[in-house]
Amino acid sequence: MVSLTIDGKDITVAKETTILDAAALLGITIPTLCWLKKVSPTGACRVCAVEIEGVDRPMTACNTPVKDGIKVTTQSEKLSRIRQKIMELMLVNHPLDCPVCDAGGECDLQNACYGLGAAKQEYGAVLERRKIRYDWPLIESDPNRCILCEKCVKVDHEIVGCNAIRVVNRGEATIIDTVDGNPLNCEFCGNCVAACPTGTLISKPFKFRGRPWAFTTTPSVCPFCATGCQIEYHSRNGRVERVTSDDSTYNSGNLCINGRFGYSYINSPDRLAEPMVKGQKADWNTAMGTAATALKQIVASHGADAVAGFGSPRVTNEDNYLFQKLMRSAIGTGNIDSEARLGFAATQKVLREMLGIAGASTTIDAIDRATAVLVVGCDLNAEATGMEYRVIKAATKNNAKLVLAAMRDIKLKKFANSHLKYRPGNETLLINALTKAVLEEGLENKEFCSANISNLSDLTAALAGVSIADAAAATGVTEADLRAAARLVGGKKGVAVIFGAELMRGGNTDAVKALINLALILGATAGDTGGLFPVYEKTNIRGLLDMGVAPDHFPGHQTDGTTFEKAWGKKLPAAAGKDLWQIIEGIEQGSVKALYLLGCDPVASFPEGERIRKALEKLELLIVQDPFPGEAAKMAHVVFPSSVAAEKNGTFTTIDGRVQPLAKAVAPSGDAREDWDILTELYNRLTGESRIHSPAAVLDEVAALVPAYASVGRTGGTITAQPRSGGLALAPVSARAVAGSPTTLLVGTILYHSGTTTTWSKNNLEIIPKGYIEIHPNDAAKLGIAEGGKVRLSAGSVKVEGTAKITPRVQPGLLFAPSHFRGMNVNALLSRDGGVVPVTVEKA
């Protein structure tokens, strides 16, 4: 610790502390321009100059560490003159085009000039106009306005890890530009725009939309991935025109392309604006009446079991709660499910059985403090970018060892100490081999295992027959790499284990169990550094299941419906309902006559899409409640146009149990209505009971019936349960090598889109407008396929065509295609068994 005096006030701080940070602890504000708390200091602007007794020149407070016994002065006439001159010199080369600059009203340079009293200009220069970069997608760069603070470069390199821009040239010719001088080719997260203190970097979609004070700012939650970033909608005249995030938020103001630019789906001209009945526009009374009458008739003729419904991770907790209440209480059916059946529901069941948790073992900020990170079967860049930022922070700021296990090269590889690029279908074998390597080398967390695990010997015995060398060869890695990976993650305190779609898709839980075994022997669930983190692409997947949108449990994962029967005053279905695939089979067999789709499009988004399409054609009643005219909506008998996240109040629950409120920024598009409002009216028409009048009232009902949500108020809260300790039972699983097929297709997410939602966003489509198929150069050469050429994939009777993208990111024999695009619809090639499928590939 170091003791010093600042402006006559004594303070003791850690020796690595800067003068700027020490002053802040005393409540003393030192002006800055180039300093940004979340990145390393640059010391470029020198506005933070301070005097230190005994030092013959002013020092920059942002990057000068404290020393014992020094006396610092932050405010004096001398410092005021210095700071004013610094500002005047900056303005010599600044165009002063404030009237037409998009940063006007929120420009740090303007504010600094005003705050420091820089009201005159004694200097002059002949300005050489520099070329404005209009050729970048989504972002415009005007180097004439740049003050060379380098905040954009620091954010790009240190937080995003993209390394797309840099400082180029020297002296008066210095500018910030792309690394190769070509148009910007990056992740288009816009974090550089947010960091820019002037109008050098601006959002092209927001350009000339208005001055910042003309917009209403509404704090909310990002509606895309399960990271749950906090955002602000900026709206005017009923339109959301911008999304930002403050650095004081849980996500430190960092967003991805979807969070910052994906908002344009809200304003899509393709939005459903009016109810429809049998393909014709109708008013709400007609649509509601048609749906209610048809549901009553089907229940009367065929029983309540003839009705089913799919909920959605895109809608709020309140919406999902009301949906399952409508199905169970008003209709009398337990046939309720969602896309969680495609993997996350089975994973959650294992987490609950083995650890007593419904999601992550702790909040995701614990990743920042991890000493080792293991990422398995997950492209964090695409599935949860906000979590990827935290892994990068752990690796670069905390020197955490990073091990990846993924079928493809992913962005995190540049930060990784080890990358186990395994063959498709061999996840469980790979994890078992890694676990055995940890145990063989004695790198398990012995203290945690001794205190908490009851059957470590069972796991050791189960792995006795596993040859690490044979497993390595079968999975496509080397024994040396496997053992090196074990040493990187083993023997550490504070291990974070993260896993995603490659492990969860299809609901085969062996790989998940194997990974939890590994996480436990590493002690990953102990303490507040590291943890166990399942990852899902869509924001409210955990809340969806917490609210009881599942055939086998009520809200709060309760299997006894007595509490809900008393609260709702209805006899509820005694047996578990049909799950997703049983519902589809029921439609095919004719026992399920009606299907209600809330915020989902199974034809475009689920595996076996063509089979599902044919099944939906057999229904007597298909109700679709959605903001967009997807494939299922085109087939619907009744369409209810609904709201998106920016048009409603409610809550989302993140994968790590943060229940966060979202606030209504604008009214629903056209004649669309909020989901909860639609559901409560239909409930009223079916039962005659009075309507619930607000999402807040729904949350109150949830809090009264679901113990985990009892402490969650209308402003949110955290429901993360601590994993069980003591008596934990490992779940040994066996695995054999999977030879695979000559060509395997992996279907997954990409950074630039989220589900099908962002395919309605013109901003996202500007970057990636259509689907494609990644193919290894060797495979492309064998088939005579050129970059950009047409490729045809076949699985059974289903055929899909797409554009070839030749890349060594995929291994030979493996193809990758993004799941988002309805026109290409590679999901139709998949079966219910997972996200990979053997395919035949040919030049189209």
Curated annotation (Swiss-Prot):
SMART domains linked to this entry: Molybdop_Fe4S4, NADH-G_4Fe-4S_3
GO cellular component, one term: plasma membrane
InterPro entries per UniProt: 2Fe-2S_ferredoxin-like_sf, 2Fe-2S_ferredoxin-type, 4Fe4S_Fe-S-bd, 4Fe4S_Fe_S_CS, Asp_de-COase-like_dom_sf, MoPterin_dinucl-bd_dom, Mopterin_OxRdtase, Mopterin_OxRdtase_4Fe-4S_dom
Regulation: Not regulated by FAD or FMN.
Binding positions for [4Fe-4S] cluster 4 per the UniProt entry: C222, C225, C229, C256
UniProt enzyme class: oxidoreductase
Keywords: 2Fe-2S, 4Fe-4S, Cell inner membrane, Cell membrane, Cytoplasm, Iron, Iron-sulfur, Membrane, Metal-binding, Oxidoreductase, Repeat
Residues involved in [4Fe-4S] cluster 2 binding: C146, C149, C152
Induction (free text): Expressed constitutively.
Annotated GO MF terms: 2 iron, 2 sulfur cluster binding; 4 iron, 4 sulfur cluster binding; metal ion binding; molybdopterin cofactor binding; NADH dehydrogenase (ubiquinone) activity; oxidoreductase activity, acting on NAD(P)H
Tree of life domain: Bacteria
4Fe-4S ferredoxin-type domain segment(s): 137-168, 177-206
Membrane disposition: Peripheral membrane protein
Residues that hold [2Fe-2S] cluster according to the record: C34, C45, C48, C62
Subcellular location: Cytoplasm; Cell inner membrane
UniProt temperature dependence: Optimum temperature is 45 degrees Celsius.
EC number in record: 1.-.-.-
Binding site residues for [4Fe-4S] cluster 1: H94, C98, C101, C107
Chain ranges of the 4Fe-4S Mo/W bis-MGD-type domain: 215-270
Function in brief: NADPH-dependent Fe(3+) reductase. Probably involved in acetate metabolism and not in the reduction of Fe(3+) chelates. Unable to utilize NADH or formate as electron donors. Unlike formate dehydrogenases, contains no W, Mo or Se. Substrates are Fe(3+)-nitrilotriacetate >> Fe(3+)-citrate or Fe(3+)-EDTA > Fe(3+)-oxyhydroxide. Also catalyzes the reduction of NADP(+) with reduced methyl viologen as electron donor. No activity with menadione as electron acceptor.
Protein name per its UniProtKB record: NADPH-Fe(3+) oxidoreductase subunit alpha
Native species: Geobacter sulfurreducens (strain ATCC 51573 / DSM 12127 / PCA)
Gene field: sfrA
